[in-house]
């Protein structure tokens, strides 16, 4: 047995048994279990909080995606509406321009017709005046005397009245 007392491993085993007994007597194992339970509870709470935050983040992400899709649809509607409005404005402007051109053309044609009619009237008046002058000259040379002058004056007045 002496041989066992000289062996350092024996003393380590005896010290270990005494230490474990002392720990058991003082209730160290309860303190360790309590600390481990406390740590497990804290980890469980952190996991629950992490799950809650994950769920909340998923809801926020879903809300963001919904809002983004809604905003994209709204933007497309705005673009479509703007294109339709631009096309309507362009068509309206084209119609107004065509109407303006048609009115201007009609007014120009009316002015041209009026000018033609005036020119024709002026030409007729000039022709009538020339015919009257020619007739007066011919008659005055062929008929002499007071009666001739009278006839020439009446004839000129009648021709002027009928031609104008």
Curated annotation (Swiss-Prot):
Pfam families: ATP-synt_B. Coiled coil: none annotated. One of its GO terms (cellular component) is plasma membrane. It is found in: Cell inner membrane. The chain crosses the membrane at residues 8-28. It is a single-pass membrane protein. Keywords: ATP synthesis, Cell inner membrane, Cell membrane, CF(0), Hydrogen ion transport, Ion transport, Membrane, Transmembrane, Transmembrane helix, Transport. CDD domains: ATP-synt_Fo_b. GO terms for molecular function: proton-transporting ATP synthase activity, rotational mechanism; proton-transporting ATPase activity, rotational mechanism. Belongs to the ATPase B chain family. F-type ATPases have 2 components, F(1) - the catalytic core - and F(0) - the membrane proton channel. F(1) has five subunits: alpha(3), beta(3), gamma(1), delta(1), epsilon(1). F(0) has three main subunits: a(1), b(2) and c(10-14). The alpha and beta chains form an alternating ring which encloses part of the gamma chain. F(1) is attached to F(0) by a central stalk formed by the gamma and epsilon chains, while a peripheral stalk is formed by the delta and b chains. F(1)F(0) ATP synthase produces ATP from ADP in the presence of a proton or sodium gradient. F-type ATPases consist of two structural domains, F(1) containing the extramembraneous catalytic core and F(0) containing the membrane proton channel, linked together by a central stalk and a peripheral stalk. During catalysis, ATP synthesis in the catalytic domain of F(1) is coupled via a rotary mechanism of the central stalk subunits to proton translocation. Component of the F(0) channel, it forms part of the peripheral stalk, linking F(1) to F(0). HAMAP family: ATP_synth_b_bprime. This is ATP synthase subunit b 1. It comes from Bradyrhizobium sp. (strain ORS 278).
């Amino acid at each position: 047995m002496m041989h066992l007392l000289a062996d350092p491993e024996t003393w380590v085993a005896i010290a270990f048994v005494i230490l474990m007994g002392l720990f058991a007597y003082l209730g160290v194992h309860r303190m360790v279990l309590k600390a481990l339970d406390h740590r497990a509870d804290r980890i469980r709470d952190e996991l629950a909080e992490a799950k809650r935050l994950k769920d909340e983040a998923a809801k926020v992400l879903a809300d963001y995606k919904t809002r983004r899709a809604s905003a994209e649809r709204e933007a497309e509607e705005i673009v479509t509406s703007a294109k339709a409005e631009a096309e309507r404005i362009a068509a309206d402007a084209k119609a107004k321009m065509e109407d303006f051109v048609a009115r201007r053309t009609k007014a120009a044609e009316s002015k041209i017709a009026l000018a033609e009619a005036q020119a024709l009237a002026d030409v007729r008046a000039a022709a009538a005046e020339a015919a009257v002058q020619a007739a007066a000259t011919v008659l005055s040379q062929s008929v002499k005397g007071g009666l001739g002058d009278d006839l020439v004056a009446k004839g000129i007045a009648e021709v002027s009245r009928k031609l104008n």
